[in-house]
């Protein structure tokens, strides 16, 4: 009989990994068998070179370029980690010209970014007030509808299970282009609006179908299931698509808009625990485009304008 597979190393994040205390913490964690995500301002800076020279670093240490005020970069560093050691904080040696921006904001806001960066799971719900105030009616409707399911199920002793997907992409079976596919076509064809460089949480439509059947067939399934296995920034997605399909116009993206905004990863661990195995994001994007190429949806039509679906209007960059 084959020996059992070794358990994966516990994974943690250390912010400010190149600092005095953090460096020793990284060294200790590596010696105890941890896989470490260390954030540094510049992984190529020689002042951080000592980290990759630590015992075990080649196998178990990953450096992430991240400032404590860049919540999107922090989210990427924290993704997949069981815990976070928030050590990063400015320690000025000289007289401070602007204490508020040089010390207070990085220390306090940076800490808040870490706390708010806790991955969102099934315990988290969309905020009704935020949805209503920003006229995000679809999200509001889905939130209220799901709350209604749970209220009804509790009162009537109904065995209910809900699956909550994010942006759904992938090839279609129906001929009419659906709303989320319109978003992808808008990105590729190059609509008139500039998009924010925000994170997109994406799931393949085929994986959503798998998830729905999985929770139905598994007797142990219960409660809510987040269905959001992948995320990518708008800028990174454009770079990925342009390399493979360089002949399209593509929408413009306002770089670095996501910096200092609250970006929190969404996790689908509960669904994965049931045996759900979603596709890689690259497969979803490429299969989506190949479908639209074959069906002619990517062909330019004279006089046709490409609109951003209203449900995604918050993806649009504000006019300066």
Regions found by a protein language model. Give the residues of each.
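Alpha-helical substrate-binding/gating segment
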Residues: 3-4, 184-193, 198-225
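NAD(P)H-binding glycine-rich loop region in Rossmannoid oxidoreductase-like domains
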Residues: 43-109
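Active-site "gating" loop of Rossmann-like NAD(P)-dependent oxidoreductase/epimerase domains
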Residues: 90-93, 118-136, 173, 188
């Amino acid at each position: 009989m084959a020996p059992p597979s070794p358990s994966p190393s516990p994974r943690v994040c250390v912010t400010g990994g190149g600092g005095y205390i953090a460096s020793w913490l990284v060294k200790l964690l590596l010696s105890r068998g941890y896989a470490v995500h260390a954030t540094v301002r510049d992984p190529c800076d020689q002042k951080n070179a000592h980290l990759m020279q630590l015992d075990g670093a080649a196998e178990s240490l990953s450096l992430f370029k991240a400032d404590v005020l860049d919540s999107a970069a922090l989210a990427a560093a924290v993704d997949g980690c069981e815990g976070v050691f928030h050590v990063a904080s400015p320690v000025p040696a000289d007289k401070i010209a602007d204490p508020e921006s040089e010390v207070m904001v990085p220390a306090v806001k940076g800490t808040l970014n870490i706390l708010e960066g806790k991955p969102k799971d099934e315990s988290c719900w969309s905020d009704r007030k935020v949805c209503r105030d920003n006229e995000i009616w679809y999200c509001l409707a889905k939130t209220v509808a799901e709350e209604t399911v749970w209220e009804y199920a509790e009162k009537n002793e109904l065995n209910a299970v809900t699956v909550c997907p994010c942006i759904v992409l992938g090839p279609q079976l129906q001929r009419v282009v659906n709303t989320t596919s319109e978003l992808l076509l808008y990105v590729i064809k190059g609509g008139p609006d500039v998009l924010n460089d925000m994170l997109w949480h994406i799931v393949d439509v085929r994986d959503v179908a798998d998830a729905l059947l999985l929770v139905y067939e598994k007797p142990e399934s219960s409660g809510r299931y987040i269905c959001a296995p992948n995320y990518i920034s708008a800028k990174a997605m454009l770079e990925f698509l342009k390399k493979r399909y360089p002949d399209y116009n593509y929408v413009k993206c306002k770089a670095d808009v996501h910096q200092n905004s609250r970006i929190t990863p969404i996790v689908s661990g509960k669904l994965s625990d049931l045996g759900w195995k979603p596709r890689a994001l690259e497969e979803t994007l490429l299969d989506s485009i190949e479908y639209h190429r074959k069906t002619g949806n990517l062909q330019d039509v004279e006089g046709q304008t490409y609109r951003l679906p209203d449900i995604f209007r918050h993806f649009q960059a504000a006019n300066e």
